[in-house]
Curated annotation (Swiss-Prot):
PANTHER family: GLUCOKINASE-1-RELATED (PTHR19443:SF30), HEXOKINASE (PTHR19443). It comes from Saccharomyces cerevisiae (strain ATCC 204508 / S288c). Coiled coil: none annotated. Present with 21100 molecules/cell in log phase SD medium. Residues 74-216 are annotated as: Hexokinase small subdomain. InterPro entries: ATPase_NBD, Hexokinase, Hexokinase_BS, Hexokinase_C, Hexokinase_N. This is Glucokinase-1. The lineage of its organism: Eukaryota, Fungi, Dikarya, Ascomycota, Saccharomycotina. Its EC number is 2.7.1.2.
Amino acid sequence: MSFDDLHKATERAVIQAVDQICDDFEVTPEKLDELTAYFIEQMEKGLAPPKEGHTLASDKGLPMIPAFVTGSPNGTERGVLLAADLGGTNFRICSVNLHGDHTFSMEQMKSKIPDDLLDDENVTSDDLFGFLARRTLAFMKKYHPDELAKGKDAKPMKLGFTFSYPVDQTSLNSGTLIRWTKGFRIADTVGKDVVQLYQEQLSAQGMPMIKVVALTNDTVGTYLSHCYTSDNTDSMTSGEISEPVIGCIFGTGTNGCYMEEINKITKLPQELRDKLIKEGKTHMIINVEWGSFDNELKHLPTTKYDVVIDQKLSTNPGFHLFEKRVSGMFLGEVLRNILVDLHSQGLLLQQYRSKEQLPRHLTTPFQLSSEVLSHIEIDDSTGLRETELSLLQSLRLPTTPTERVQIQKLVRAISRRSAYLAAVPLAAILIKTNALNKRYHGEVEIGCDGSVVEYYPGFRSMLRHALALSPLGAEGERKVHLKIAKDGSGVGAALCALVA
């Protein structure tokens, strides 16, 4: 066989292998139907009392955590409140001034979480919450020095705490950590009340005036923030035809929340439900924690790459399997694993004779960000030069034009699967709550936050296409308005503190 023939045969083998992988990543309309039906089933199961012997930490179903928020803002609320937000990489403290006209202003300070708090398994709760309190003190010195100087005589300042990890929440201001997901490994925090841990450190560091009155997460915050800033929140009375029904995040992680009828949240004690209904409260926000959807893998599409990422590379094997197929944290990692695999099969990057010779960035888990994929996704330059530069900059990886064509195909298959799967919880919630049929026109708004839904090219279009292919159908999809909700974790937490 001549060199040319060998080259063509290899090229055909590469195309065949890549096409097969792309097929494995396809989510068909039938699969969307199956997943949506199962999601609704898991929601119902999660709203019911847990089976005997089951806990939120051990259960593989949807957590469906009551957020103890029974109303949504309408944009007329006023006041100055504090908000703290512990995410996967940063801690942020804000002072939010609600103006009462759907607008707000904010002072904020963001701090990177030190690597030793993330990586060291010997770190304690006191280490972490001590760091949060020190950053809060620095913020108070800068923006509220007068209140700080008054000490115990200062007027209480309400703080809403956005804590974006699964908690077993028992009231608006208490919740115990179920498990860490992104980043942290601090074992002694699991099972403890995170509000109490933060409050103790605030008091210990001379800030008794700060009262942590509400525990929320970024998703509930996104929903509340969208309700506050949306002109359609009072649509029932204003005559507008759309209203906010879901808050969701598609960023580093993914999650969502929605308003559920209190009568249907049978996991809440009967006396509490009766008390709330007597007070005229009919609905409560449910934090779905949908990153955990189908942890048993009964229906989720699964490739060998998903298995490796979950079992060998993630910090929480067996959990958050939906998130590992959808969120920005994992999109680049899926591509990286595919490239390493295709190299090992002798199909791509053959200038490197062995895995050991591959660029270190390519063999290091989580080195390839979804931002790189977003550049490749829309590259239409000659010879895919943009892709070439992106791979050189991010991975120090030289590629041929032929390889780049195949890599772009893979990127588009990975992102399409992510967007199609992202449509499943949205379709399921809209169907379960009958949101599209509640009144004439029945148009709804979904408040979205997160880098993937906001910035990834074509993600929202692909998500909408999947909604049209889902049981909602094209007619249902047309009634859905996806809106970017800005800064849910700051404003939303402040709004949570306001209702406390």
